Structure formats: C-alpha cells, structure tokens
Amino acid sequence: MASRRTKSPDQIVSLRETLVSAGLEPRLADLLDAMPHRLIQVEPRRPFREPGAPRSEVMFVRSGILAKFKPDASGGRQIVALRFPGEGILPGKAPAHYGIQAIVRSQVMVGEARDFTALVEQHPAMRQFFCRLLQRNEDIGYEWLVNCGRRDATSRVAHLLCETAVRMNRGDGGLANPFTQQQIADMTGQTSVNVNRVLADMERQGLIRRKGREIEFVDWAEMRRIGSFQPAYLEI
C-alpha cells in the first residue's frame, strides 16, 4: 500500500484512498475500509510488538513510520524494514521473527487477521492485489540486503536517503529526515559515529545541504549514482 501523494510522517493518510491509488477496485477498498479495527497511537520509546509475537493482526500506518527490527545476542539490533504512511504489515500463521517499533510517533490501524483473511479469500482480485504488495516488499528487502552487504558506508546512506525521499513522495528536492543517526546506523549496518562522518562528507562534497532535520538534495543525480539507486523496485 503506497499513496502517491507527497506525505510527511505526521500527515494522516486514508486507507481507502491509498488502496484505490495503488490499483485496488473501489468496491474492494470499501470492504477493507469498513473492516473492524482499532486506532492505536504508537510511541517510539519502546517496542510496539516484541519478536516472537503472534502475527494475528493486519496493520496500516496512517501516520508516522514503523520499523521491523531483529535484535542480536549483544543487545544491538538491525532495522530490517520500514513502513511509511500508506504502507502496512500483513498477518501470517507463524510467530513474527522480528519486532515492531515506531521511528516517530505513529498512528496505526490494527485489525484482526481472521477478518482480513476472510475478505481476501472471498475476492480473488483482492488476493492478487496483496500478492503484488508482498512482491514489492520482497523487492525492497533484496535492495536492503545488497545495501548492507555489498555497498560502502557512503553508498548505504545515500541509497537509504534516496529511497526514503521516494517512499515519502518528496521527489528529488529533499526530505525532512525522520531518522536519528543511530537509527540510520541500525538500518545500514554501521556505527552512529560513522553515519555522522558520512553525512558531513556528503555536505562538504556539495551533495546535500542540512538545516535542522531538513536535508536538501543539492545533486540528486549524483546521490542516486553513489547509492546505485534505481526506484523501479518501489512500484506496485
């Protein structure tokens, strides 16, 4: 689920509008929009769902950003996926092998898996739609794997910033950076000290300009080149 409107993490997006914009028939979007759900405000200070929790819910991010994370034995963690406004987390049969935590204060629609599954099973077009969403999430996961496994520190951060700008529909102008340097480190497999150095180097090289949390892409084409960023994998 991904709306094409420009959005910031604190902007509330509509489930129905997002589904229709992504290609689902309006009548099917209406069924999902009418499904029983709770609206939950998720604070970023502690996990929303711990690793090993049942995947008995379907989630839709109305505002904010959710992160999936994997802890390690030393107490550290790797952020392995993000969900921006207009994106969601689908249920599954097995317990989750990841935790969920908000990057910023977020509003999340949470429904029961049994209600969601019943609708999907009744409507083949809905099933096909969510298969496409799962394929998109898988493609994003492959990009993240390559980013952490094969690219250098600067390329990793460049790719993350480019992807974030596109997923937030901010285009090539820049973005209000929603991440702390530690969060960027947890996403790109490096230390926060190294992330600070990379961002400073990007600014010195004339690639970006920073003012508070705002990051302006001074040279978008070069940022894309450095990060090997080709956005086709983000399409549904």
Question: Positions of the model-derived regions?
Answer:
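Cyclic nucleotide-binding regulatory module and flanking cytosolic helices
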Residues: M1-P44, P85-I89
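Short aromatic/basic micro-patch
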Residues: L39, L82, V110, P178, ...
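Cyclic nucleotide-binding regulatory domains
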Residues: R46-V104
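Histidine- and aromatic-rich ligand-binding microenvironments
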Residues: A53, V61, E112, D219, ...
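Cyclic-nucleotide recognition modules
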Residues: I79-D139, E143
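Polybasic "coupling" helices that flank or enter modular domains
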Residues: E121-G189
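Phosphate-/nucleic-acid-contacting segments
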Residues: A165-I236
